[in-house]
Amino acid sequence: MSPAVLNITMAFTFSLLGTLMFRSHLMSTLLCLEGMMLSLFMLATITPLNTHSMIMFPIPIAILVFAACEAAVGLALLAKISNTYGSDFVQNLNLLQC
């Protein structure tokens, strides 16, 4: 395993651990999810270059599309929750209420 792939894998792992550990604020969870998507994008960009596979070249573009959609939905949800409840604490939310 090359050092670049190892660093990207470690970045994904640390972002996943951050998502699991810092669940109290919605903003920190969204930042960790963005870190995961960035590391997946970098890994999907490096892999076709190393394997010389032409079929895998559109995959990074699809990952960028999903990352942009995830960021837009996350920021809209953060704005709505912040305006409604006054903070982004996840523990204070009862999402089962209508």
Curated annotation (Swiss-Prot):
Major localization class: mitochondrion
EC number, UniProt record: 7.1.1.2
Pfam families: Oxidored_q2
Record keywords: Electron transport, Membrane, Mitochondrion, Mitochondrion inner membrane, NAD, Respiratory chain, Translocase, Transmembrane, Transmembrane helix, Transport, Ubiquinone
GO biological process, one term: ATP synthesis coupled electron transport
InterPro entries in UniProt: NADH_UbQ_OxRdtase_chain4L/K (IPR001133), NUOK/Mnh_C1-like (IPR039428)
A GO term from the CC aspect: mitochondrial inner membrane
Transmembrane segments: 2-22, 26-46, 59-79
Localisation: Mitochondrion inner membrane
Gene Ontology MF terms: NADH dehydrogenase (ubiquinone) activity
Catalytic activity: a ubiquinone + NADH + 5 H(+)(in) = a ubiquinol + NAD(+) + 4 H(+)(out)
Recorded topology in the membrane: Multi-pass membrane protein
Family listed: Belongs to the complex I subunit 4L family.
The protein's role, per its UniProt record: Core subunit of the mitochondrial membrane respiratory chain NADH dehydrogenase (Complex I) which catalyzes electron transfer from NADH through the respiratory chain, using ubiquinone as an electron acceptor. Part of the enzyme membrane arm which is embedded in the lipid bilayer and involved in proton translocation.
Subunit relationships: Core subunit of respiratory chain NADH dehydrogenase (Complex I) which is composed of 45 different subunits.
Protein known as: NADH-ubiquinone oxidoreductase chain 4L
Species assigned in the record: Alexandromys kikuchii
